[in-house]
Amino acid sequence: MANTLYDRTIAFAGMCQAVALVQQIARNGHCDQDAFETSIKAILNTNPANTLDVFGNESQLKLGLECLVKGIDSTPTGSEVTRYLISLMALERKLMGRNDAMSQLGDRIQMVQRQTEHYDLFEEQMISNVASIYLDVISPIGPRIQVTGTPTVLQQTSNQHKVRALLLSGIRSAVLWRQVGGRRRHLIFGRKKMVEQAQILLARM
């Protein structure tokens, strides 16, 4: 993995995309399906050729790049995005310090990879299996991420599964972000450069 601005922007957009999708589901009970599929597939891509390969291509990160450019601001929605991002980074840091959890995470992801040989990854049961990895491996590490949205929507089991699966995808991108040199300080001091890079990528779509 190269430690370039491009790589950090791609990894950060992956985090942003997972967060934007969590917001969509938590509020409305549905989300951009193409972006959702990209984010969930990224969890299972554990041996990528490069940073972009985790997600496929740049256009598959359009929602995340747009969130990076326009979504992180002082509005209530923007503040929520920032809160989710900081929470994901904090969880990733705790995860990295726990060899037992990392080993368990790897085993559980491999199990889902094997299941995809027989089942569609986007069947409800498979999304539930991905969500259970977050619930069993990531949640106990803490701190818990408080998801805000429409209560009646969040009470639906299928939406809870999608949200947890997306939070796991956010962790996947947070791990990638650290691998390519991303640090929490970049959220404050390096974001302008990432926004400029994201704008270039969006302009050529």
UniProtKB/Swiss-Prot annotation:
Keyword presence, Membrane: yes
Location relative to the cell: Cytoplasm; Cell inner membrane
InterPro entries, per the entry: HflD, HflD-like_sf
Coiled-coil features, chain-numbered ranges: none
DNA damage as UniProt keyword: no
Annotated GO CC locations: cytoplasm; plasma membrane
Family: Belongs to the HflD family.
PANTHER family: HIGH FREQUENCY LYSOGENIZATION PROTEIN HFLD
Protein name in the entry: High frequency lysogenization protein HflD homolog
Species for this entry: Vibrio vulnificus (strain YJ016)
Lineage, highest ranks first: Bacteria, Pseudomonadati, Pseudomonadota, Gammaproteobacteria, Vibrionales
